[in-house]
A protein has these predicted regions:
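Cytosolic regulatory regions of ion transport systems
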Residues: 1-449
Length: 449
């Protein structure tokens, strides 16, 4: 597809890379010429220097012929104006990044009077991700599919875990409609068969219905979060506190800027707001950080978040949630079993890629959702089986899938099925697939050739 991206910041750059990898025709609009030249050369994209809300620039970029127009600058108003112009000029779909809470009210979201195809708020998406993590604190990560019907969680198999030494067949007998999709063993990813055995140190990715996963989560380690400490009063904290408003979790927030601390204290009177440096060891000890069930370190400085997270882990914090913007730093912290990393850039890019791939329809089936897990090494895909699909009506055992492919779930008439080889695919089904294969755009890409 022909896709125009406006803005070459962190999200825009990552989007260009992902779109080029999937063989889309990408045009980049960026005000800074040196940035544009560097990225145009690196990713082999066509570039236009200028303001994405400028009619002449959009005309030069031939926005009238684009399939998807994506505005990702750091200015909400520029994104919205450029997308409105692009739509009027003939762009088929428009996606905008909007971060300001003022533009996240119910009227703007639900009525969508500006006609955007998708509104992406990285901080709000990250807050929702953290809220899921707070709900399931024993999991290293939590992803949702099929409008929340299916959940994918990552767990560490610890020394005293009852999962150690258990085969996949034994696991399925014990837990019913829950599947181990992938095992990460010392960096090697495995799609397990029935005879595969879990070992101490494995990171396992498990999927199932929300209610079944809640029971499994309790089985792993019956621990809930009653006290939460937030470090940093940014947009993520703002959205997270709104999400948790009706929750019974006791929340304390530490913020070093006076105006922000006062604002949060007024907006969220139920939250204990402390003025100070939440990354300072002495203050954390003074505020009894070790007594909290979970701490989310959400400042704007990656290094401070990582170092603070490491200190908190030394205090024995059960659940460490750490914001890291630069993916190059993930390896430093990703091996620690009590830590959940959130990367707003990656969450935003994944959201946009869900949409783009959903619009990139094949004749027989459509790929309408995509999630990256394990730092992008695992893809979870959602396909819809359409009328002329050749695999409709066949048993899963009759289909020869390529190595590294697992059918995790079938969504049929709003209900989730966690299949065996005897289940058949029907027209209208949505299937959730976990795979080690990259850049899959069609369900037939998953079959042996």
């Amino acid at each position: 597809m022909r896709i125009i991206v406006v803005g070459a910041g962190k999200v825009g750059t990552a989007l260009c890379r992902s779109l080029v990898e999937e063989k889309h025709d990408v045009i980049l609009i960026e005000e800074k010429e040196e940035v544009l030249k560097r990225l145009s050369k690196r990713y082999d994209v066509m570039g236009f220097a200028g303001n994405g809300a400028n009619f002449k620039i959009l005309e030069q970029a031939e926005v009238s012929n684009c399939d998807v127009f994506i505005a990702m600058t750091d200015k909400d108003e520029v994104n919205m104006i450029s997308a409105v112009l692009a739509k009027q000029m003939g762009a088929k779909e428009t996606i905008v990044r909007v971060r300001n809470p003022e533009y996240s009210n119910a009227y703007f979201k639900d009525k969508n009077f500006l006609g955007f195809s998708l509104v992406v708020n990285p901080e709000l998406l990250t807050a929702r991700y953290i809220a899921n993590t707070v709900e399931f604190p024993n999991a290293l990560s939590v992803e949702t599919f099929a409008n929340g019907r299916v959940i994918l969680m990552a767990f560490k198999v610890t020394e005293n875990s009852q999962l150690s030494g258990m085969t996949m067949e034994q696991f399925r007998r014990k837990f019913g409609n829950i599947l181990v999709c992938t095992i990460d063993r010392q960096g090697e990813l495995i799609i397990p068969d029935g005879n595969a055995t879990m070992q101490i140190g494995d990171k396992i990715y498990v999927t199932g219905k929300r209610v079944d996963m809640a029971l499994f989560h309790s089985y792993i380690k019956p621990k809930s979060i009653k006290k939460l400490l937030l470090i940093g009063a940014g947009r993520i904290s703002y959205y997270l506190l709104n999400i948790l408003k009706n929750n019974r979790i006791k929340v304390k927030l530490i913020e070093q800027k006076m105006d922000r601390a006062q604002n949060f204290s007024q907006v969220f009177p139920e939250v204990s707001v402390i003025l100070g440096d939440g990354t300072a060891k002495d203050l954390l000890l003074e505020e009894s950080a070790a007594s909290y069930d979970a701490v989310a370190t959400l400042t704007g400085v990656d290094e401070e978040n990582i170092i603070t997270s490491m200190f908190l882990e030394s205090l024995g914090i059960h659940k460490n949630i750490t914001k890291v913007n630069r993916t190059s730093l993930l390896e430093i912290i990703d091996t620690r079993e009590t830590t959940t990393i959130v990367t707003p850039k990656s969450i935003a890019v994944d959201t946009v890629m869900h949409f783009v791939r959903g619009r990139y329809n094949a004749k027989d089936s459509s790929l309408d959702a995509l999630h990256h897990v394990a730092n992008g090494r695992i893809e979870t895909l959602q396909f819809q089986i359409k009328e002329n699909n050749k695999i409709a009506g066949k048993k899963l055992s009759e289909l020869e899938f390529a190595n590294g492919v697992l059918i995790a779930a079938i969504i049929r008439n709003g209900k989730s099925i966690f299949p065996t080889g005897e289940d058949r695919l029907a027209i209208g089904d949505k299937i959730v697939i976990v795979t080690l294969l990259q850049n899959v755009t069609h369900i037939y890409d998953l079959l042996k050739r």
